[in-house]
Amino acid sequence: MPASRLTSALLSCALLFGVLANAGEISASVAVDTPLANVTAGVNATVSSSGAEVDISANIEIDSHNVKPKACHAPLPAKGTAAPSDPFWLEVIKHQGSSPHNPDPANYQVFRNVKDFGAVGDGVHDDAAAINAAIQAGNRCGGGSCPSSTITPAIVYFPKGTYLVSTSIIPYYYTQLIGDAKNPPTILAAETFSDLAVIDANPYIPNGGGAQYWINQNNFFRSIRNFVIDVRRVPADKASGTGIHWQVSQSTSLMNIVVHMSEDENTAHQGIWMENGSGGFMGDLVFNGGKYGIWGGNQQFTVRNLTINNAKTGIFSVWNWGWTYQGINLNNCQIGFDLQTPITAAQAIIDAVVTNTPIFIQTSTASNGTLAAAGSLVLNNAKLNNVGAAVAVADGTVVLAGGTKTIASWGQGNVYKGSNSQGTFQQGNLANPSKASSLLDGSGKIVGRTHPQYENYKASDFVSVKDLGAKGDGVTDDTKILNEILRKYAGCKIIFFDAGHYIVTDTVYIPPNTRMVGEAWTVLAGKGPKFSDQKHPKVVFQVGKACETGIVEITDIIFSTVGPNVAGAIIVEWNIHEPESVKAGAGMWDSHIRTGGVAGTNLENANCPRDGSAGFENCYAGFLSLHITEKASAYLEGTWVWLADHDLDGDGNSQISVYSGRGILSESQGPVWLIGTGSEHHAVYQYRLVNAANHYMGLIQTESPYYQPTPAAPTPFAYNPKYDPKPYKDDAPSAWGLSVERSRGIFIFGAGLYSFFKSYSQDCINDRKCQAQIANIDTASSVNIFSLATVAAGKQISVNSVGIIDQSANVNGFVSTVTSWSSR
């Protein structure tokens, strides 16, 4: 942070302390020369950095510009307390999670250990049937007859061991497959294995004419983590030696997985096979051997920290609209990326290291000077060690020479700058904008941080909110008890939110040094009249207060609301800033903000049908989903901020008309990392940055509301100058996918901004214009966007709300692609 910014921040924090002192009572007697770190006061006040109403009533400690609850007497050890021989805490902690909206909540089992269902894990017995029995128990959503369900969540846990399987493991909808994080178990494919993949997330129905268990674009809420998958017993020439069939959509993750495959010359093995979908995030993956590390086709995906060793082809891209790869290591592969062009529309690769690989990137077609012929490609900070060709065509033509060197910034596609509506096709070096040092690790790469799993901690380092009195039954008001638990145990214990639906009717404050862990996406939801007034919005979950610093880690949680009218709900206000010495120290992983469309929200098809007959008042889902405030930092990985467009429960298909005002608003001075995030269907905007600085965003994905422009944005919300950009002048405005105002140091590396409907009709797709404009950057901002894909937006980028770049100049299959745009 520049000195001027830092001084301003400290002054404003000091002013805040003055406000607190004037609003409350300073009960201590303090000498004028007393160090600030030693001042303690009791304060009652109503203060929020957003201006929204937030009740603060707690004893606080003022410590080096921090306002925080009194520290616990026994802080959580920084490096954990578990001995190497201790079991992974998840295996032995008390499991009392529930699914309160299940027809039989008292008997439904959320957590299930595969060994309780007969799995042996000795590498000899066939455990496939036992594992699938553990997955299926409880009348869960699978088999092809259930399009989706949130009322049968499950964690299927694998203790350490080797699990031999002769048939596929099929994770049903809303399933987390979790292995022992201390000693990841091995899933070993039998020599006779002949199914599609060892783990199949969307099976084809036998004799079903190509039908599958779930619609791929709606195959939400899945996670697989902590496994070694070994297919080397399967004959090398059999493609059934595939680790994971991963045809999925948003709110899905793969993490901490190693796949071992044959390295024979005739190998047909694959690490991941993915033919369709709309993802998604995956990270911390290693693929050894095989014909393909990843064989992939999907609208969009974010991949972080991927290593592929000794594969014939590291990544085979059969089609996409836009993928972002961050932190890629390719070693001893014949081809790093094999892109089937032009149907692979856009590939963006940052912080890659490629070693002893003849071809880093190969396109199947030559560009011949046009985007449409070979798609868009962006490389940023790619280090080559003994690489024959950096970019080549399948016919042998070398586009960019290899060697041992670093490619700072290079691209293939249409490049634009500022307000100039005329782009140029480039196949060469691109301007390489500087990135804020706060966004980078010690080696100059964008920071990436693995999903915390606390494998070095014992079960006794955790407390259960249900043990401490919270109900999570979807009915009881848990506001008071959750505030008490968080106040008491932040920094002392890891707080385990047993599976359930926790209702709060007032602000819940999440203090610095809170580590909170959900179970199969525990739901925390705001409800009631305090969140009903959009003229006076109120925070539901407040993560830190303005000027507070500290560790915050939130994993496997869903923040939500309960209708009928929560038009004033700011669902999450993020004020916390990471400690200076801990990059990405304040973040969320595999946690989402989801409103409407599921059991328990009162915002389903029965309440808010697509035709709008229920009216606005009954169908407000929130005012603003996520507000990252000025003094905050944030690391968000795999976070989906989704206003439901259809029911996930009920028939799983019916479209609904529910209304959320705004998606993600950031005013942060940084650092902020938005890695593999999405924001969809909010009335005014999906992403907005205002007076912000030092953001890395890649990949971001949006969809505009299906009902717009009937009514047009911002209806049914009133224009609010404190939270909203000025509406653009159009006869029927729709929501901004992205709006950036008075911001600097904004680095967007992969964006998919989509508009699929116009007043619930898709006829506009044919004309490629379901809305007039979709991304706006003002002239006061410094922004660089790489690999922007849009769907059916007339103007892809606007400057000061005036459309500049017409999509027709950048048609790239179904999408239109801008390879690079810089504001200056």
Where are these regions (language model features)?
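Extracellular "leader-to-stem" segments immediately downstream of a signal peptide or signal-anchor
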Residues: 2-155, 168-170, 182-243, 247-255, ...
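Tight coil/turn sites that cap or link beta-strands
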Residues: 160-162, 174, 499-500, 507, ...
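C-terminal, well-structured subdomains that either form a transmembrane helix-short loop-helix hairpin
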Residues: 484, 488-489, 494-507, 660-689, ...
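Classical protein tyrosine phosphatase
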Residues: 167-168, 172-180, 504-522, 685-686, ...
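Internal alpha-helical scaffold/solenoid segments in large eukaryotic proteins
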Residues: 167, 175, 289-291, 299-315, ...
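Active-site proximal loops enriched in glycine and acidic residues that flank catalytic Cys/His/Asp
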Residues: 319, 341, 365, 499, ...
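Beta-strand cores of modular interaction/reader domains in eukaryotic scaffold and signaling proteins
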Residues: 113, 157-159, 176-178, 496-498, ...
